[in-house]
Amino acid sequence: MRYTTSFIVFCFLIFLQTNLVKGRTIRICDRKVEGNGTCGPNSNNICLDEFWKNPPSPRLAKSLEGCTCEPRGKRPKFKGLSHVCWCCWSYNSSNPAG
């Protein structure tokens, strides 16, 4: 048990040191993509496919963390069921979007 605890503490210290050297990581979830259809069981793949069709910038695509799908129901703009995807990415506070 003593060696397990030491290993866990050692890993935590490495994690802490890495974050102190690199700076604080900032996570942003404001990339909104709308589309036709419902979210369904493969909603993350639907959102990622829509994101990759039109990424905001090549640098941002490197730090993409994932997307979440929200059903929006029937809306006149889409002439049927629709959904909205919110995509998140992260960057280091000392080096934005890189």
Swiss-Prot record:
Keyword field contains Cell membrane: no
InterPro entries: SCRL
SS bond partners: 29-88, 39-69, 47-85, 67-87
Signal peptide annotation: 1-23
Keyword entries, A-Z: Antimicrobial, Disulfide bond, Fungicide, Plant defense, Secreted, Signal
Gene Ontology cellular component annotations, sorted alphabetically: extracellular region
Entry keyword annotation includes Disulfide bond: yes
Compartments (UniProt record): Secreted
Family under the similarity heading: Belongs to the DEFL family.
Name of this chain's protein: Defensin-like protein 241
Gene name tied to this protein: SCRL19
